């Protein structure tokens, strides 16, 4: 009997466990798209509309059937993307590292590959969040001139409060997360209205916690990641945009709540396969794989500020 790919795959349990616990503090996409696992690649995502906010008849007469209500609806199929790279450890490097206590070159190589895959996940999450076509006209604003938060005459707080009210009227909850492009974070730290607000505190700098207090949201995170294109051009992953959203709390992410987005990840991933020796290059190789897709499932729960920088 032939084996399928899942049965044939031999995992390195220690490195796989390490991979599943791997995090990179520089990446913030999970703040908008928390990870939920999928048992299979063939599944459809649950999307959210305004049906959960419609007034329903709940009163029941004796002997009458009980009304039923289903939240959300089965939406588009989730197309998981497989990201795969091999961590290569030349035996010469391994021999040299063996003379130094505490150095595990195999794990170092896996960490390097995991960082590359995590960057790809961050880029995909940012692309989904920054796609203006995914938002209703009421839930986005392309800023220009004195509206830009980098302009000293702008009023970011008023704009955020207006956006919070848009989201509240769409989903009945106030947003709890604000993601800022890295350059935008720096600009807000110098904005005259914000520095004047915190001047009595004698703070040396405007922190993210202070911005969260200023905008009255639970969490403000700064998307500082960059990457280089093939031509050498450096790209700011989150650009000069800001995304305000309501994201389901950690204990409620399996429930049909109108959360902004999720990263659907195949169960058992990421994984690291057992090392194999490649005689042609005299190196050990560990294949690292992950399968995921960042999905905007509740655009009503978000607001996109385009070109705020």
Label every PLM stretch briefly.
Residues 68, 93-94, 103, 169, ...:
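Generic alpha-helix detector with strongest preference for long hydrophobic helices that associate
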Residues 71-72, 171:
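Residue-level detector of transmembrane insertion/anchoring sites
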Residues 73-98:
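Short acidic, glycine/tyrosine-flanked loop/strand segments centered on an H-E-D-like triad
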Residues 91-174, 182-195, 308:
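Alpha-helical scaffold segments that mediate packing/assembly in large oligomeric complexes
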Residues 48, 62-69:
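Hydrophobic, aromatic-lined core segments that form the binding pocket/scaffold
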């Amino acid at each position: 009997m032939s084996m399928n790919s899942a049965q044939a795959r031999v995992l390195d349990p220690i490195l796989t466990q390490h991979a599943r616990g791997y995090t990179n503090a520089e990446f913030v996409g999970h703040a908008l798209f928390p990870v939920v696992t999928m048992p299979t690649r063939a599944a459809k995502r649950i999307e959210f509309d305004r049906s959960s906010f419609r007034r329903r008849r709940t009163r029941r007469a004796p002997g009458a059937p009980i009304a039923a209500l289903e939240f959300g609806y089965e939406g588009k199929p989730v197309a998981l993307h497989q990201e795969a790279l091999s961590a290569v450890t030349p035996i010469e490097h391994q021999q040299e590292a063996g003379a130094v206590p505490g150095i595990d070159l195999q794990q170092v190589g896996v960490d390097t590959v995991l960082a590359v895959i995590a960057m790809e996940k961050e880029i995909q999450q940012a692309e989904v969040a920054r796609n203006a076509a995914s938002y209703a006209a009421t839930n986005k604003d392309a800023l220009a001139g004195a509206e830009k938060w980098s302009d000293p005459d702008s009023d970011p707080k008023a704009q955020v409060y207006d956006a919070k009210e848009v989201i509240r009227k769409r989903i009945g909850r106030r947003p709890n997360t604000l993601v800022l492009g890295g350059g935008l974070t720096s600009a807000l730290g110098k904005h005259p209205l914000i520095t004047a607000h915190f001047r009595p505190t004698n703070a040396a700098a405007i922190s993210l916690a202070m911005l969260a207090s200023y905008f009255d949201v639970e969490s403000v995170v700064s998307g500082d990641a960059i990457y280089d294109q093939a031509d050498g051009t450096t790209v700011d992953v989150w650009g000069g945009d800001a995304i305000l959203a309501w994201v389901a709390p950690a204990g409620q992410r399996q429930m049909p709540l109108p959360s902004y987005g999720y990263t659907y990840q195949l169960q058992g991933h990421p994984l690291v396969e057992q090392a194999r020796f490649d005689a042609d290059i005299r190196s050990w190789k560990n294949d690292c794989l992950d399968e995921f897709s960042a999905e905007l499932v509740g655009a009503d729960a978000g607001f996109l500020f385009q070109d705020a920088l």
